[in-house]
Amino acid sequence: MQEPGTPTEPDPAPITFERNPDDYLHWDLTFDPPIAYLSMNVDPGGATLGDYELKLNSYDIGVDIELASAVRRIRLEHPEVRCVVLMSAIQGTFCAGANIRMLAASSHAHKVNFCKFTNETRLEIEEASARSGLRFLAAINGACSGGGYELAMACDHLLLVDDSASAVSLPELPLLGVLPGTGGLTRLTDKRHVRRDRADMFATKPEGVRGREAVEWGLVDELAPISDFDESVRQRALALAATSDRDADAEPIMVPEMDPTIDGDTHRYRNVTAEHDRPNRSIDVTVHSDARPDWPLRTALELDDLLCHLRFNEPSVATIVLHARGSIDDVLAHDDQLANPANHAARETSLLWARVLSRLDLTARSLIATIEPGSCFAGILAELSLAADRTYMLEGTFEDDADHLPAAEVLLTPVNTGPMPMANGITRLRSRLWGDDTAHGEALDAVGQRLDAEAAESLGLV
């Protein structure tokens, strides 16, 4: 028991998720269109959470936040880039994976959210290639183990230096007695189609596999001699860039600063507000509609920043109550560009929304949506109510409402029928009505109709 008057340890500073490339501590980002070079150069003394040393390009959450920032900025701000080379600035070392001392000292909640965040970043790399035409090349110039190999496997092509020493490995099982935590085994078998017996053997070899054997087993795609490694990387990157459909002449989308205002228990962005109800371990998150052209991009970025903040800095929050306030017409003004993106800006904004909604799905809190007079759960914001575990809609109006707001309505649009898939590849509408094809068909027939509470309930939407 602590004696009265004994100084207490200050609460750790909250983890923040906005990063400017000029302030990156662990990554060097350079451009030689159509190629961007993203070089891992982890500062050993730049730990985010403690006094552990980030040796051998090992990473913690701060390193991966910068990686996520770099990938997002390349996608949005640099349409001229068609291939990203992930590489290392440390000779003989690509990446040693997640820092073991950091993991040992972290809470269980942090470990879970850390692994979840890092995998979401790798999923974004894969999605950028599959849906945005941005290719990724892993230039493996040295030892590549654990999470480092998981990062490399997220790329389209793995080029390993052939120096008789550099190897790829997943040493978690033999050295730590745990399975790889960021999709390593799944990518090994389901993505790279490594034969099962080889995958089993690989996962028990802490020294890993190198050279021609790594190519034969399908662990990497190509070898390059150390004397010609840099040129081999460039030529392979150019070949990958040639397969991209990105519009090099498109207007860049500059990432705005979020700059949230925090006043006690209120977290306020321009379009998103969060208010804590700490006694009940809940938080009210309100998305406000706006007809301004930058609303879709900015709102997605704000909601994403808030979700990351809640995951890492607010572990006591058990329930997120979702609100959407404003005009349905304002939301619909952005609907077509999200459902049918016709240019770089629209495509990247639509894909960003899909990723943010997936992060909401996987945030591991109870989600409740409340649809009331003044709500605007339509189109992209209807995805919030479809993501919720429980959705409640007020029938009629509040008797004591001084503003005399009209009764709440819900409106499904083409955005809700395919462009925003969940992580499992199906829509939230299909997931909500899973196993009932008749109900799903009736909901699709109601696309474009403004639904009151009775109609929404009859369709299974609330």
Language model features with spans:
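Mobile "lid/hinge" segments at catalytic clefts and subdomain interfaces of large enzymes
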Residues: 169-200, 208-212
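Short beta-alpha connecting loops at secondary-structure transitions
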Residues: 105-106, 171-174, 186, 198-200, ...
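Amphipathic alpha-helical segments at domain termini/boundaries
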Residues: 1-47, 150-154, 193-295, 331, ...
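ABC transporter nucleotide-binding domains
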Residues: 49-50, 57, 301
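Active-site-proximal segments of catalytic enzyme domains
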Residues: 113
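A structural preference for short, pocket-lining loop segments at secondary-structure junctions
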Residues: 33-40, 60-109, 119-139, 161-165, ...
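Alpha-helical scaffold segments in soluble metabolic enzymes
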Residues: 73, 120, 187, 213, ...
